[in-house]
């Protein structure tokens, strides 16, 4: 089958797949270290979804009041509901201030205080004095377009350091030999050629799989391509049952209203005009952790206190804030609310509803970004030649629930750490290990089979079925009955993939084929998500079970590892959470009841 296609071969020291915040920080970091670096991306780099990140990036700079990276670590561990690995969380929080200053030096146009320091706003779950003090102003912001500012700056740095970009190239599969990754096969959408990239290290920075759900803040390109490739390579994914619902997606549109809106003083109300978060989180109120706020909103709606004709959403009030604050600190939100909700935020509340926003789960890695698998003794062993960073990865710094503004931090800290590790492991221009023709043939055969699929089901119809099933069966609240039913339905939908129909057989700009390949990636991840959720019989972070309402550390303080074997069977395994710190600069944070 390889002879039927024009395959172009390349050799690089490193290939990064994805050009969002994590991918670009990794790519130029590696190029800066003297490694011949390629960056493959299915869309132009500055269209990557990092551009949509609004509220900010967290670091204990202390510009707006006393702060300490140890407090930041405590909040992150608590936010993770004690499922985050404390060594990785320490690494991230300790390196956060330097990461921000590095971004500033690269040219990120952060908003400023009157003294000229980087402006920091409060965000959910961020406190001082190990949770005993007041809310921390820790989230560094560039108005409400922080991701946009960071992504453009990182792209400029990538060009400066001569990263070779392959733009509008779609990654098909990893080249694996003897349990090692030796490259990646991709499809050039512009001219229809297939490319075999050989590399000493492949970095997956492909983002999350939010589009497995019907309503998500994610772009339609967020199809978890890295996770799909990892599953097909026989690797497990970690903690996939933990899907974050952002409290404030615009009702019916799903577009994000940043948590920064509540950080600036916005608040939620029900049909009675009551600020209901005071009942659920008396101390933090509207700035409780995202899973807490999303559940509170869902309960209000369920109990008949929702607003609107169908009583199926709540209101976010910003109209008490001065127009000057809205214009200077939340300009994008004002525009988004006007376009997608028809609301003037200076006069009217915004209709909002919890919306799928972030995947805490992903490809398991250590804090160097190296992909890890569990060996027979419950220890981790590294998959040679393969790294994963950003939302595609599970380090795990977010555990069962991510704190707002820790995601942009995750991107730059672990993007940088992956580059440093790669430079340590790889000698520039060293010879590549061989690959078997059969490995390449297998990838091309799968691609060709999908391309010539001539069944009865349209890709769009099957995708919609999956999205609606995930929305109804793996949502904010879950039960065994609903999850088991969802697992059966997603399995059936995945089986339906064998009967898809591709109308366009061409190789140049074939969006029908792109969407079919993306759907394959989404279906595998949807499947392991719902099976992992059905297996975890407790409530922790974003995984809220009505039939098991309490956290159960004795049985369930462990990471889920889920994979799909060659027969298509779901395999669920577990490994311990790392409860020890990296250094003695801070003691391990013992599990406690999570109250805001």
From Swiss-Prot:
GO BP, one annotated term: tricarboxylic acid cycle
Keywords on record: Cell inner membrane, Cell membrane, Electron transport, FAD, Flavoprotein, Membrane, Oxidoreductase, Transport, Tricarboxylic acid cycle
Binding, FAD: 18-23, 41-56, 225, 391, 407-408
Subcellular location as annotated: Cell inner membrane
Catalyzed reaction equations: a quinone + succinate = fumarate + a quinol
Domain of life: Bacteria
EC number(s) from the headed UniProt entry: 1.3.5.1
Active site residues of this protein: 290
Pathway this chain belongs to: Carbohydrate metabolism; tricarboxylic acid cycle; fumarate from succinate (bacterial route): step 1/1
SUPFAM superfamilies, A to Z: FAD/NAD(P)-binding domain, Succinate dehydrogenase/fumarate reductase flavoprotein C-terminal domain, Succinate dehydrogenase/fumarate reductase flavoprotein, catalytic domain
PROSITE patterns, sorted: FRD_SDH_FAD_BINDING
Tele-8alpha-FAD histidine sites (modified residues): 49
InterPro entries: FAD-dep_OxRdtase_2_FAD-bd, FAD/NAD-bd_sf, FRD_SDH_FAD_BS, Fum_R/Succ_DH_flav-like_C_sf, Fum_Rdtase/Succ_DH_flav-like_C, SdhA/FrdA/AprA, Succ_DH/fumarate_Rdtase_cat_sf, Succ_DH_flav_su_fwd
Cofactors that this protein relies on: FAD
GO cellular component labels: plasma membrane
Molecular function per GO: electron transfer activity; flavin adenine dinucleotide binding; succinate dehydrogenase (quinone) activity
Annotated binding of substrate, by residue: 246, 258, 357, 402
The family this protein is said to belong to: Belongs to the FAD-dependent oxidoreductase 2 family. FRD/SDH subfamily.
PANTHER family recorded: SUCCINATE DEHYDROGENASE 2 FLAVOPROTEIN SUBUNIT (PTHR11632), SUCCINATE DEHYDROGENASE [UBIQUINONE] FLAVOPROTEIN SUBUNIT, MITOCHONDRIAL (PTHR11632:SF51)
Subunit structure: Part of an enzyme complex containing four subunits: a flavoprotein, an iron-sulfur, cytochrome b-556, and a hydrophobic anchor protein.
NCBIfam families: sdhA_forward (TIGR01816), sdhA_frdA_Gneg (TIGR01812)
Identification of the protein by name: Succinate dehydrogenase flavoprotein subunit
Lineage per the UniProt record: Bacteria, Pseudomonadati, Pseudomonadota, Alphaproteobacteria, Rickettsiales
Gene: sdhA
